[in-house]
């Protein structure tokens, strides 16, 4: 779905850009919505355990990312709950460039979905042989040598509904996909899904996506707008939330992207008044849209009543 919408009966009131399908045609940096995949790769490769007693040291500077002096050691769950860049980068340093590239390639990034080829922009995934020193670090939290469209990002999250395997996207309901590619192990996928459940708790950055009475898991993301090939100088943001429900065997996955969000929810802190992030914009849009879907799904409702 795209908004603002257009009225074909009054096409003279719109420009060609108004008719653009932004879900397929816009290539963007997905920001922190990619952090779960970094942790999945690390868990599969055995460089983390993602247990409650495993602690990641976040006291040392890595590249341009400085310690925030708020945390000294963090669990993987806390890193994802707080969307902590340095913690994610520390984990990424344990991984090989080739493994990153291969996993992101299997997730479909940089490749056409084949849904509507005439309008789709598949983005890019630069080959690891052309990466600089900072590219792996940037890639670990959704920046650097990759761009993607929103449909590709939503598709990547389908692994949480398919035990780590990636199906193709379909426009026709109930068509069977017998060529799913296994990207991550079922065990690792289930563990990270459990952690994403905590991201939408009151402790996590996605708590505004919580829907009372329903299971929801997901991840926030924020990226600076790229205008004419350069990051915006006026602080323009693009915010994301990608989530799914229920947490175990999800039936619905939704990806939300907001461009130039201007009115973002803030609480008591006046310094955050103009600070738009996935947590206080896209997560709220997700909450409203997903809630309407869940309360109108007879199957979901019958399970709640049983």
Where are these regions (language model features)?
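Beta-lactam-recognizing serine transpeptidase/beta-lactamase-like catalytic domain environment
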Residues: 1-32, 37-265, 278
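Short, gly/Ser/Thr-rich active-site loops of penicillin-recognizing serine hydrolases
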Residues: 180, 273-306
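A hydrophobic, small-residue-rich beta->alpha segment in the mid-to-C-terminal subdomain
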Residues: 261, 271-273
């Amino acid at each position: 779905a795209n908004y603002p919408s257009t009225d074909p009966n009054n096409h003279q009131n719109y420009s060609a850009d108004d008719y653009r399908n932004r879900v397929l045609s816009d290539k963007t940096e997905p920001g922190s919505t990619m952090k779960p995949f970094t942790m999945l790769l690390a868990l599969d490769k055995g460089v983390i355990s993602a247990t409650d007693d495993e602690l990641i040291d976040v006291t040392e500077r890595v590249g341009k990312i400085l310690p925030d002096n708020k945390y000294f050691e963090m669990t993987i769950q806390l890193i994802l709950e707080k969307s902590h860049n340095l913690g994610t980068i520390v984990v990424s340093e344990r991984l090989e460039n080739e493994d990153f590239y291969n996993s992101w390639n299997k997730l479909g990034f940089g490749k056409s979905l084949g849904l509507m080829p005439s309008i789709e922009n598949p983005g890019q995934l630069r080959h690891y042989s052309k990466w600089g020193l900072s590219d792996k670090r940037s890639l670990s939290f959704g920046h650097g040598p990759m761009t993607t469209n929103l449909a590709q990002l939503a598709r990547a999250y389908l692994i949480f509904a398919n035990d780590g395997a990636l199906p193709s996207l379909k426009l026709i309901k109930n068509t069977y996909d017998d060529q799913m590619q296994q990207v991550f192990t079922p065990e690792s996928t289930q563990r990270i899904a459990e952690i994403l459940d905590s991201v939408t708790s009151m402790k996590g950055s996605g708590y505004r996506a919580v829907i009372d009475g329903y299971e929801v898991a997901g991840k926030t993301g924020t990226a600076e707008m790229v205008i004419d090939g350069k990051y915006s100088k006026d602080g323009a943001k693009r915010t994301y939330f990608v989530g799914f429900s229920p947490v175990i065997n999800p039936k619905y996955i939704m990806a939300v992207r907001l461009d130039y969000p201007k009115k973002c929810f803030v609480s008591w802190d006046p310094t955050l008044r103009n600070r738009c992030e996935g947590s206080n914009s896209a997560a709220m849009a997700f909450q409203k849209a997903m809630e309407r879907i869940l309360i109108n799904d007879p199957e979901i409702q019958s399970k709640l009543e049983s």
